[in-house]
Regions:
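Glycine-rich phosphate-binding loop of ATP-dependent small-molecule kinases
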Residues: 1-198
């Protein structure tokens, strides 16, 4: 989802607001909020709503969000979705990527992230030019703790329990756009754009 969000962001010229990236930066910087979030992230659990929503609201006031934005990683619960509505944060469309759990596990196992700048790669689908080295800054590519198989399985259980109910929440509001897996990032992204323009 993050890779598709980045591509859409470039094509639509609007920022992707990734809660994961914002939280990881806070953890790396050792901010009080980052330290609070770290224990949840390391366990593959969801970070409390008040932490997530505070970060999101602050970020959406930036000038680059004036013409729109893509939220990646929020909302993850009905409570977060309702809180976003109460904060006056308007969500026009919700993209629902229809991907099997086994495919997600395989994709996450191949993900690598730059330890310096946070750029994301995949050993098969989006490799760096030099194995293990970031194309952007030359930093080392690493496997994040939350991409390890046992953590991915825990995250999927959490998704099915807490996030999957959002499908009906947004479908009832006429905002849900279901996107079947198209087999490649490029094909999926083209399909998403076509559906958003419909």
């Amino acid at each position: 989802k993050g890779t598709n969000a980045e591509i859409l962001s470039d094509k639509l010229n609007i920022p992707t607001i990734s809660t994961g990236n914002i939280l990881r930066a806070a953890v790396k910087d050792g901010t009080p909020m980052g330290l609070k979030a770290k224990s949840f992230m390391d366990a593959g659990a969801l970070v409390p709503d008040e932490v997530i929503l505070g970060i999101i609201k602050e970020r959406l006031t930036a000038s680059d969000c004036a013409n729109g934005f893509i939220l990646d990683g929020v909302p993850r619960t009905i409570a977060q979705a309702e809180a976003l509505e109460q904060l006056g944060i308007e969500i026009d469309k919700v993209v629902n990527l229809l991907v099997e759990d086994s495919t997600i596990e395989a994709r996450m196992a191949g993900r690598r992230v730059c330890a310096k700048c946070g750029a994301s790669y995949h050993i098969k689908n989006k490799p760096s030019k030099v194995e293990g080295v970031c194309d952007r800054c030359g930093g080392e590519l690493v496997i994040r703790k939350d991409d390890r198989p046992e953590t991915v399985r825990d995250r999927l259980v959490t998704y099915h329990q807490q996030t999957e109910p959002l499908v009906d929440f947004y479908r009832k509001r006429g905002k849900l756009v279901d996107i079947p897996d198209q087999g490649s990032i490029e094909a999926t992204n083209a399909y998403i754009l076509k559906q958003l323009e419909a």
